[in-house]
């Protein structure tokens, strides 16, 4: 190319440029392989027991008939379900969810009937097989939330489905013009989809408070699919499992769907005592 006298031109080498392009192409291919491997590793796996699998496969639309799903998220919510509902003994383990992310390494399907401390476990009512409970102590990453909902609810018949979600939240995150120090902690708030018509035993969650994590993902999924769903959030000032926060969920037993699932009071108190004691032992560094 013609140029004027004294102009400095940059040196161009076709060979070097082609080598750089080849290296960049190799790096991009390697990056794509790494991303694909991570995506495979972060897949959410839902495993049902043989009876449920057979029921799904024999169904005309290959979905499990289901009238009620109760999802408990976190230690205190699962503690309530374990003490007040599962302690009746009329439940059986029917499935589990395994996943992998930066805070959860529960990636291997379980072969026994006992839930792992950091797993999602499904229980089915023996007296009414259309009722399912899911206890979730796992951390579900943001990129896994939609997949979680798709995998779980994609296996269930939605025509007569109702969903109830329980979780806790630090009272410091509750947005109110009043001081949180004056609030009667712990306390319940409810958030429901437009299809949910039943009365709730506590005040509704006020704006600008919002749901997040798995409860928000489940509620959003139910809103889109027009599934009646309600989310009960317990605001507490304690981060660990404790009987006071667990008992804060007791008003839910006044709901018709929950009251018929409640265990006997003697079994409730015994299981509650064991649950709290077990948590205290595990949190003691000297034991």
Curated annotation (Swiss-Prot):
Q: Which GO terms describe its biological process?
A: chaperone-mediated protein complex assembly; proteasome assembly
Q: How is the polypeptide modified once translated? A: Degraded by the proteasome upon completion of 20S proteasome maturation.
Cite the InterPro entries for this sequence: Proteasome_assmbl_chp_1
Main localization (coarse): cytoplasm
Chain positions covered by the region annotation Disordered: 1-32
> What stretches pass through the bilayer?
none
| Subcellular location(s) of the protein | Cytoplasm; Endoplasmic reticulum
An example of a Pfam family matching this protein is PAC1
Q: Where is the composition biased (Acidic residues)?
A: 17-32
Which UniProt keywords are present, listed alphabetically? Chaperone, Cytoplasm, Endoplasmic reticulum
Top-level division of the source organism's lineage: Eukaryota
Family that this chain belongs to? Belongs to the PSMG1 family.
State the protein's purpose: Chaperone protein which promotes assembly of the 20S proteasome as part of a heterodimer with psmg2.
Assembly description: Forms a heterodimer with psmg2.
Q: What is this protein called?
A: Proteasome assembly chaperone 1
